[in-house]
Design a protein with these regions (language model features):
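The feature marks the mature, well-folded catalytic cores of soluble enzymes
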Residues: 1-113
Length: 113
């Protein structure tokens, strides 16, 4: 699949900095707000293929974090989807990847799961 896309002039970039012009397609796992800002700053065309469920989780995490809640995200911390949700929540978030990690958290009243 990647080869056939490459034959059409479509490639994978690890950073928006690799692009000077053209169109960026965001995959279904989504990305954090800094990527959207970089795309806009460079004047690149955007095709956002973020899954609607992921987008909803991102926006919910952002809203709750902006309201002062601490957001707990359950999942693998290095999974792209989890990383993107955490980036939207910012510093007011925590990723839990196992039951053991969950058992070691001291919950306070403004944490949202």
């Amino acid at each position: 699949m990647v080869k056939s896309l490459a034959d059409e002039g479509i490639g994978i970039v690890e950073s928006v900095d690799e692009m000077e012009n053209g169109k960026i397609i965001i995959r279904s796992h989504g990305v954090g707000p800094s990527i959207y800002d970089a795309i806009k700053a460079k004047g690149l065309e955007l095709a956002d293929a973020t899954c609607p469920h992921v987008k909803k989780a991102q926006m919910s995490a952002k809203t709750l974090a902006d309201e002062g809640f601490k957001v707990i995200i359950i999942g693998e911390k290095n999974h792209p989807e989890v990383k993107s949700i955490k980036e939207w929540a910012g510093k007011n978030s925590l990723v839990i990847g196992s039951q053991e990690e969950a058992e070691n958290i001291a919950f306070v009243s403004n944490w949202v799961l």
